[in-house]
Design a protein with these regions (language model features):
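Walker B catalytic acidic pair
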Residues: 154-155
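Conserved pre-motif I regulatory segment
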Residues: 2-38
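SF2 helicase motor core recognition
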Residues: 130-134, 190-192, 359-363, 388, ...
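A conserved SF2-helicase RecA2
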Residues: 430-497
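Conserved motor-coupling elements within RecA-like helicase/translocase cores
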Residues: 104-122, 385-402
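Conserved Helicase C-terminal RecA-like lobe
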Residues: 1-2, 30-31, 42-70, 129, ...
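Conserved helix/coil segment N-terminal to the catalytic DExD/H
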Residues: 104-120, 127-147
Length: 497
């Protein structure tokens, strides 16, 4: 049964009512075989895709969807997006891919082969498509369910490289599915050539070119460079971008926060970050020590409890200061998730962390990724003259300084940073006043856009309680006492594995 666009939206049992721009997106793309939701971060791409899937299910077109996202955040679809936004009126199940599953996880993965009267979601990390096992799984899913299936890629700039193994594998397997979707907030004009591979995943020659080199020749300005005995064409600029945008608009919908009139002035969201094995091990050791001290009556003051929480929070950021003052570091996914956010953000970004080591590492990584002049740090070590220069440069719309990396205790008061409409909390302060004041650096007189606030959270850790408390305007210094501290320390990251 085919349901036309208007009937689908009028009759669809939304779990959460869509904003007007989401209705426009669904009207344009819900029934297209290949479509892109190129919606700026904070405008609700995930909900739009889930409503799209529900509409196709009720139309009789799909009963299976495989969704891809980067490894650090793909579980967010399982724990947050699908439960919060997919219609309760549609029976559904969600199965998560794990590359090295235990017995319980393997049983869950294999359950996909069992008949199910309803909608099945199969969630995978995009990195799995660089492995034989992941490609074989997707190919099997496509052959079995693809005729009434949808394949979607969240943060689709992860497949921008046509030479990458994962991109080639996804394009090939994607054609087994009746419907294909991409989700990204990255503006096409920032890196126009990145759209080619994403469009090829949606369908061959959607951009009107049979090869990447033909596409590059039309839209890029190149110069021949020599490196030793080798010569190559280096991209030095772009052309015909208005034409390219017009072509892309035929199979996608683009919207910016500033154009979403019914969005609230402040939009809050979280990005989940998976702990590395090293972080999980150290986190559990420290929380075990804390519970032992609590049970023995040794943790009696607010200050000693907060000190224990602080050690846990350091581990979540990928480092720990020992009792001797030495700094120990751990592998972490948090900085790479931040880089993904910064890639997707259209304009300038404020990044807050309470830790000096974070600020230094973040600034260094962003400079490495986006250029030496792209990031600046504002914390205790920053001189007064440098602080003034950083704020002035950041507030200039055309200045290359895009990322303000600061400590809320130092930079959260008095300064104006309204050129940014994206604010990321890498590691929150426990101080409620620091949170309130740091939010207001972007949201104050002079801000012309909606402001998106993103908290990085590792599931099953104190991150969850910290963010919940701060958003409820609870000052943590007076809150985490007695049984409250015990409950925080009982949180187990392993429960999310």
């Amino acid at each position: 049964m085919y349901v036309n666009h208007e009937t689908a939206l009028d009759d669809y049992p939304f779990k959460t009512q869509p904003y007007e721009h989401q209705r426009v997106a669904l009207n344009k793309g819900a029934h297209r075989e290949a479509y892109g939701y190129l919606m700026e971060m904070g405008t609700g791409k995930s909900k739009t895709l889930l409503d799209n899937i529900g509409i196709l299910y009720l139309s009789g077109h799909v009963n299976f969807a495989v969704l891809f996202a980067p490894k650090g955040v793909y579980r967010n679809w399982v724990s947050k997006e699908i439960p919060e936004h997919f219609s309760d009126s549609i029976p559904h199940r969600t199965i998560r891919w794990v590359s090295s599953p235990n017995a319980t996880q393997l049983k869950e993965i294999r359950s996909v082969a069992q008949p199910f009267e309803g909608m099945t979601f199969f969630v995978m990390n995009i990195e799995a498509l660089s492995t034989v096992k992941g490609v074989e799984a997707l190919t099997w899913l496509g052959k079995k369910f693809g005729a009434k299936g949808l394949i979607g890629v969240d943060e689709s700039t992860t497949i921008k490289n046509m030479k990458a193994k994962r991109t080639k594998n996804l394009i090939k397997a994607g054609q087994l599915f009746a419907y294909r979707r991409i989700l990204t907030g990255s503006p096409v004009t920032k890196a126009p050539l990145d759209i080619y591979a994403q469009a090829e995943f949606l369908g061959p020659r959607l951009l009107g070119h049979s090869s990447y080199y033909s596409f590059q020749g039309r839209y890029a300005v190149t110069q021949k460079r020599k490196m030793g005995a080798h010569s190559f064409e280096q991209v030095v600029g772009y052309r015909n971008l208005e034409e390219l945008s017009g072509i892309i608009s035929q199979f996608s919908y683009r919207v910016l926060k500033k154009d979403c009139l019914d969005l609230p002035e402040k939009v809050y969201t979280v990005r989940e970050v998976e702990l590395t094995p090293e972080q999980t091990k150290m986190y559990n050791e420290i929380r075990g020590e804390g519970l032992t001290l609590l049970d023995g009556g040794e943790l009696v003051s607010t200050q000693s409890i907060i000190a224990q929480m602080l050690r846990l929070q350091q581990v979540l950021s990928g480092h720990l200061k020992t009792d001797d003052g030495d700094l120990v570091t751990f592998p972490t996914n948090r900085i790479e998730e931040l880089v993904s956010i910064c890639e997707e953000a259209g304009g300038k970004v404020i990044i807050w962390s309470r830790f000096r080591h974070d600020i230094q590492q973040i600034t260094q990584r962003l400079k490495q990724e986006f250029g030496e002049d792209s990031a600046a740090s504002y914390y205790g070590d920053t001189s007064d003259d440098e602080r003034l220069r950083i704020v002035q440069d950041f507030q200039k719309p055309d200045h290359p300084l895009r990322f303000f990396v600061g400590n809320a205790a130092t930079a959260g008061y008095g300064i104006t940073l309204t050129e940014a409409n994206t604010v990321v909390y890498f590691a929150n302060s426990f101080d409620l006043e620091h949170r309130i004041q740091s939010e207001d650096r972007a949201h104050r007189l002079g801000q012309k856009n909606k402001v998106l606030y993103i908290d990085l959270i590792s599931p099953g850790t104190i991150d969850e309680r910290i963010v919940k408390a701060l958003r409820q305007k609870i000052d943590l210094g007076a809150k985490v006492l007695g049984e409250e501290a015990r409950e925080w320390l009982r949180l187990d990251p392993k429960r999310m594995k």
